[in-house]
Amino acid sequence: MLGISGLIATWRPTLDTAARNAWGLSFGDGVEKAERTPSVLISEGPHRDLYRFGALWTPKGNPVLLVPPLAVSADCYDLRAGQSLAAHLLNGGNTPYLLDYGTMRYSDRGMGFEAWVDDIIPEAIRTISDLHDGAPVSLIGWSLGGTMSLLTGSAHSDLPIASITAIGTPIDYTKIPAISPLRLIGKYTGDTPLTSATNLVGGLPAPLVQASYKVTALQREVLKPWFIVRNLHNTETLARMESIDKFMAAMPGYPGKAFQQICEQLMLGNNLFHDAVTLAGREIKLSALSVPVLAVGGTTDVIAPIASVEAITSVLTGAQSVRFEKAPGSHLGLVAGPTARDSTWAFIDEFLKENAPQLVSTN
């Protein structure tokens, strides 16, 4: 039977860890310094910096473009070691690339989805394909990043796209309970209550984006103090929490026109589901998309519930194949949660392998 000294010796490492973590969270720089996957800047321009992950200059694996959503830091695909889809793809033999839109300012208020669908994303796809001797590029988009990827592929059938993966991307907005009150009001008022104030300031400011995201994870925010106390001895768990907090705090804002399009065409009009999104004066139909598509929905995602994501299977009537998978996790958890490796990432691995382009290397 252990005496007091024995008990102290047994629990000492745990107590020391808890003390270090408590200090780091309260007075220090956190419990862990986040290490990002090495990357190289390939090209740069306004809201279109393109990075390639990996230390080698010569791309060797199948090209994959990670497309972030609007109003979200591009770090969503590379939060830290263990929470990095980019690192996972790289270690799996792919060559992952990342678009970074940077910060949205008042001067960007006129940027709508067409800026990405007709310009920024196609330019990145062509650049990457050229680096790989013309090989088609696999697109992976989380949330609205998936929306923009799907619209890009639908609008530009000539682009060298191998496949598209949409993670937590809602298609049927009537299946999102959180916005039901807004849709009800919108039947009588249109998008004016949602967009009138943002039009004055040129978009949805970053603080409002950050606050709205926290509201969707209200239970997490309320229970966070208890969560920290219960896990003071678990550095990995706290580091995951900390990486998410930093990610949320770095969310940029929406440009005014894009936010208006989200309200009018996606939330109120449900135009993705009705297969009729209008950008730059012409109609884009998801049914025109021909490449293979993987869609992943989160079982606890309140921003894009399962039913809203699964609706993609009835809309993409022209796609070569449409695969839908359920994965445990919240909206961000689908991409960077503790179960992502064995669910979302595993689905992506299988899908990319099944749809790998034939031409994959350079000299």
Language-model-derived ranges and their functions:
Residues 289, 295-297, 301:
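Short beta-strand/loop motif that positions the catalytic acidic residue
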Residues 110-131:
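Alpha/beta-hydrolase active-site loop
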Residues 35-105:
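Short, surface-exposed "cap/lid" segments of acyl-processing enzymes
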Residues 328-343:
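Catalytic histidine-centered segment of alpha/beta-hydrolase-like enzymes
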Residues 313-332:
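Catalytic histidine neighborhood in serine/cysteine hydrolases
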Residues 302-308:
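Conserved alpha/beta-hydrolase "acid-adjacent" motif
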Residues 140-145, 149:
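Gly/Ala-rich beta-loop-alpha elbow adjacent to hydrolase catalytic centers
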Residues 1-7, 130, 134, 149-257:
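Alpha/beta-hydrolase-fold enzymes
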